[in-house]
Amino acid sequence: MAMGKDVLILGNKSSEQKHDLRDSLTEKYIGGMGETARRMLPGTNPDWQGGILRFKMKVDSEKQNYFTVRCWGSESDNAMVMLFIEGKQLGYRHLGDYDLLHRGNGGTPCQGRFYYYTVPLPLNYTRGKKEVNLEMRSYGNTWDYGDTFEKYQKKMEGPTIGFYKVYMDVQPCFLPDKNEKQGKDEVSLAPVRPAPGIEVLNQLKETVSARINHILAKDTPLGQQEVWLLADAYSVKWTPAFQNPKVVDAVIRNIDHYYTKYLEKPAIISSDPSVYNGDWMTTCLLARSIRSLWSELQDSLEVSVNGATRRDIWSQLMIASLDYGTTHRRHYTNQSMIIDMAIYECNRALMLMNPRKALPEYQTLRYLYESLALAPWLGKETPDGPERPLGDHYWQLTDKALTKELGFVGYYGEVVDWLIHIYRATAIPGVPFSGDLKIKDQLLRVANARYNFRYPAIDEEGYKCFRAEAVVGWRDGNHYPGDVIYGDRGTAWDATPLMAAAATLDQRTVGVAQQMLEDNQFFYAVAEKLKDAGNIRVLQSYLHIPDEYELIMKQTPSEEKLPMSVSAPDYVFSDEEDGVVAIKNGSEILYASLYWRARNAVNNLAKVHYITPTFERLANVHIETEFEDSGMRYTRPDWVNLGFAGWREWYKGIHSAHAGEVLPIARIPEGVKFKPGDENIYAGKADYYELKYGNYVIAINGSTDKTFELSVPKAKAVFNLTDHKKKVEEDVLKVSPRTTVVLEVR
């Protein structure tokens, strides 16, 4: 006999007693809309572990059970909450396919509304049982890049958000009772931000000018980022660096000094602490400086320095960078782009100084084309030629122009700024719009694909905005809510809010930029960036913001808007290679990754973000797949931290509820090196995905040569959202290669 929905009302004495709730370091309170809730607290001497809620919940003894929590979207924290079943941890703390229950980022995800978060319970813990013992354990947040426990695991220094109710059900799409209180449509009622205004550009100019004057006055060696700031500012009229001879002297002096450091420590080429990700960037910023100031620098190159000409010693730096970069290429898209951009910049500088020692232009341009999916990606160079670790036909972007890492990624997939840097690298310094046209076209394709993943929301102060969708992203750990983003991820270190529009003057990018200006989120984004002025990498991005603003303000109004705008027509965007969909259907928006963090094997899991005017749902759910079975199997290790590796297993005494699960591995193409346990884009990729979630049925055919059949649900009416909302009369629909079908069941 099927179980009905079991509900625990937290803060309600009767309900808590019924579920045998026991707690430590928690408090109950009256929260959103007058509802009771409990939140977990840190200890009196804050440590990384906090309060715990322990309780029992009824389960269905045969079917898949789903656990859901109800949270108030106006609350925020910087804590993490993991769910445990019978003493074992569910999900992973960082980027697991079975996701964690909660991780705050200090933001309020949907102000004035509730949201529901759903995760699946392992069948082997519920089969044959009527109830299970569950725990919600709280922890401090983590810093994802920490390489020691102390750096990685932060102390819990404040309370968690409140948890209002927990539910157990067999439906993957949680349906709240009709009498459950919900918020109102805050998004459509949100006002336009009144401030700040243009005064922030004056503040920006003062901040940049002060930093440049400080750098010019230094009598100690400059780092690469400082050198590039001066060189870049040399052509910016409002800065004290503009056509300032001291800039040229400083650039020459400090590249010479860098060579001295290189002689003392050749490894500095890939480990320079003055530049971010030195093993990616090498001497890219010095190369940019040389290219930018070439007419001012070239007469000094025959001067003798350390027994050789300046031309020769600077060339040695570029050659060393090329040797390292070409043999250390990476396949994650954003990393590939940055590394290949650095290779290209260094080679172009070398072509100016010592063309006979430079690589052919077509070779370094080919690297860029590979990173941008204008040519197949072949990997690093070896003595026998390109390594080809993913075969001869791996493309860094999908046909729909999304990155593959391995599936859809939110923030790491926001690579338009890097494409613009690459486009500018191929341009003649000082000549706008002179970059490679194929690269320009590709960056516009990528920008248009990313626009599908911005949704209407409200910012932290209650004003109208658009946010980036990252809930369904493979490499997005705590990005709910997502950042305020329109076209470009303007608050990122190397980006500016109007970057794509200013670099291309394409009508759609200009329209999206104008939409940001209409909502008065541009000046706020600049003000937010100014908070990081101490980071010279961020300050570097300030240089061109005023000129970009002036350029966009001169453009005629564009009718183009973001596709999820309230006034925009309904539509479905699908990317069959990434296994992701974005659906606008009336007042509802649904994002789903059906190919979800399947790094090692096919996992039959998806991630969903379902947005309605009055509440939101986030869910980690089971789906159906079809694929060619390799016959190989992957057994989940007993990992509880990283969902993809076992080298940070610092949480002694905690064990995974998923350990021992055996998963099938899809067919690996011939010629691709692989063994069970390897992360591989082919190992977990199915040919066909099918998700049933609430009133939606989503079928994705990711294959290039197979057709699958989708059984149409029996219902009063079914409409095909991918075919002009036509009413479906058939019992079965054909899903052709590289197509998606989305049905709405009414």
Q: What is each residue range found by the language model?
A:
Residues 1-188:
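Extracytoplasmic
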Residues 54, 80, 203, 207, ...:
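Short, acidic/polar N-cap/turn motifs at the starts of alpha helices
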Residues 77-85, 713-728:
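Solvent-exposed beta-hairpin/edge-strand motifs
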Residues 188-208:
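N-terminal module-boundary/linker segments of secreted carbohydrate-active enzymes
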Residues 209, 213-440:
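Aromatic-lined, polymer-binding surfaces characteristic
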Residues 729-746:
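C-terminal beta-strand-rich structural cap/linker in extracellular carbohydrate-active enzymes
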